[in-house]
């Protein structure tokens, strides 16, 4: 059973004792947590019958562990003013149908680490902009993510400028229709393995890898893909270092289509490996 508790580790306040953390509830109201100099650890019991919609932190928080019922506002960031490590433990997300923009940057784009194994995603149908502009995160562990109900992954990782590794090998994408801009502007990624992706229902891959300027190797093995240029416009735009695309097990129509797309996106010297 979810305990509705938030634990905080706080660094040096540098003499500023007028600091508070606010937990806002979906049903209305909030819990205000005073943060005092010298007190480094906090364990706050939240209201048992309410769902968190927003967590407004302070820059001095080094770690937050959330074990609570969550129902964030669709299309709005769940957490603000936070630049430490965020961990979810046994959270109740049963009232959520989407996680659109849940960790989107903006006020808290300096967040450095996310631990998501306690975040249940089995009922989620949309993850568009979920990690958009998480600019300081270098790695995201998604090994626990259940994506079998997801239909929308538009801009899911867009503008994750510092992201160096991304393992999506466990993603079930058989229901996904929109991958527009999914990895756009992930400028530190050097390789990406999407060989497990089922793209049979996808109707939009526009700008999917746009400005992945350091991407060198892309694995699309097993893809069955036949979108028009309009629906895959600028899919590889700005991938200036892309040299190798693995397409093992792909039919010739898919191979020809991918070649046409990257040629239209003004890429040169890309090698297709089929065996």
Model-derived features: where do they sit?
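Short, aromatic/basic amphipathic alpha-helical patches
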Residues: 233-234, 254-266
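N-terminal targeting peptides
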Residues: 4-47, 51-54
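Small-residue (G/S/T/A) turn/hinge positions that recur once per unit in extracellular repeat modules
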Residues: 50, 77, 97-98, 235
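Register-specific detector for alpha-helical tandem repeat solenoids, activating on a conserved position
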Residues: 100-101, 128-129, 154-155, 180-181, ...
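Structural signature of tandem-repeat unit edges
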Residues: 33, 37-71, 82-97, 108-125, ...
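Acidic, Ser/Thr
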Residues: 104
């Amino acid at each position: 059973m979810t305990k509705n508790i938030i634990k905080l580790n706080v660094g040096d306040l540098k003499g500023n004792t007028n600091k508070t953390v606010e937990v806002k509830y979906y049903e209305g109201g909030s819990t205000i947590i005073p943060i005092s100099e010298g007190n480094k650890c906090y364990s706050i019991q939240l209201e048992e019958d309410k769902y968190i919609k927003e967590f407004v932190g302070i820059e001095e928080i080094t770690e937050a562990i959330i074990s609570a019922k969550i129902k964030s506002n669709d299309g709005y960031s769940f957490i603000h003013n936070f630049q430490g490590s965020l961990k979810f433990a046994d959270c109740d997300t049963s009232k959520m149908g989407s996680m659109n923009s849940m960790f989107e940057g903006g006020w808290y784009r300096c967040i450095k680490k996310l631990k998501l194994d306690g975040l249940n995603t089995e009922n989620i149908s949309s993850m568009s902009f979920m990690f958009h502009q998480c600019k300081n995160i270098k790695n995201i562990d998604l090994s626990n993510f259940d994506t079998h109900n997801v239909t929308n992954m538009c801009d899911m990782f867009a503008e994750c400028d510092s992201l160096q590794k991304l393992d999506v090998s466990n993603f079930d994408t058989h229901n996904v229709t929109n991958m527009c801009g999914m990895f756009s502007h992930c400028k530190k990624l050097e390789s990406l393995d999407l060989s497990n992706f089922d793209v049979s229902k996808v109707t939009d891959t526009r700008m999917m890898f746009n400005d992945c300027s350091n991407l060198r190797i892309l694995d699309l093995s097993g893809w069955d893909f036949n979108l028009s240029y309009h629906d895959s416009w600028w899919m590889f735009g700005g991938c200036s270092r892309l040299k190798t695309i693995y397409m093992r097990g792909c039919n010739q129509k898919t191979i020809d289509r991918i070649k046409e797309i990257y040629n239209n996106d003004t890429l040169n010297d890309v090698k297709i490996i089929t065996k």
